[in-house]
Amino acid sequence: VRAVQENFSLTATGFMMSGYFVGYFIGAATIPNLISRVGHIRVFAAFASLASLVILIHSIFINPFVWFILRVLTGVSMVCIYTVAESWLNDRSNNKNRGSVLSIYMVILYSTMGIGMFLLNFSSPENYQPFILVSIITSLALIPILLTKKKPPTFKKIKAMSLRELYEASPFGMVSSLFYGTIQSALFTLLAVYAASMNFSIFEISFVTFLLAISGAVSQFPIGKLSDIYDRRLVIVIVTFGAAIFSICCIFSVGLMYLPEGHATTKNWFFLFLTLFSFCSLPMFSLILACLLYTSDAADDTPCVD
């Protein structure tokens, strides 16, 4: 939103936002060695602190290239934080309840993401206050994990897994994760930018991103529970088909916004179809992850990154 207000071009905005996933890739490749050296808790603390710092720097340097570098650092930080959390949950779950456990985790994640979107309404994105507020919230995440008495997962020495080995171990899981990652990265990165370019108000921008996150949160547990009862691959196929249908509906609802005012429907149709699309698509992350981890459970000699 701030990038649109600063009149960054769409190309510059897309380039800047892609830095998050560049950092995500870098972090995913390096975090196993970090965890093996210093442990889960120290990795979480270090990168939560880095994320909090990087957020503040955004408000100092208003430049697409600088923001690209900052987004890379944010991506590295967040993938390390997520990996610690998810490996901890994986260590405490088994194949019988993993779908439900990961779904509860995703409910919490998406719910807080959705609620956090409304922070845009406390102060204009043109000011520095939103950056400070997000930095404070990020820093607060350190307190529970630094004070916990629970023992972190025991880190097991892992073998690097090539893409070919991953495909042979779980072809469905690998292909699904590639498509899911491509779609969801574009959605979460550019939805707010798209809404701003459509002249949505600040409240409407926060509301549409809230709908995206909260509907995904609501659907996590029931769909995760179904995946524990039925074949996860079948559940993934069904929700993928539903997401495809509702994404097409979103396209047509956007077209209605360009009709003359007397004949156009309101933005409510777009909100409705986006909600249904999110309801079907967002649970796929936990389902795909559970599929990949099931392969690891089924074969002790299958290398798997926590």
Language model segments and positions:
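Helix-to-loop junctions at the C-terminal end of transmembrane segments
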Residues: 28-39, 220-231
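Structural signature of the two symmetry-related core transmembrane helices
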Residues: 43-56, 235-248
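C-terminal membrane-cytosol helix-exit motif in multi-pass small-molecule transporters
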Residues: 135-154
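Cytoplasmic helix-loop-helix junction between adjacent transmembrane helices
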Residues: 74-105
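Residue-level signature of mid-helix packing/kink "hotspots" within the transmembrane helices
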Residues: 21-25, 29, 113-114, 213-217, ...
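Helix-breaking motifs and short loop linkers at transmembrane-helix boundaries and internal kinks
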Residues: 61-62, 231, 253-254
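Conserved small/polar residues in nucleotide/adenosyl-binding loops
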Residues: 294-301
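Paired small-residue
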Residues: 65-73, 268-276
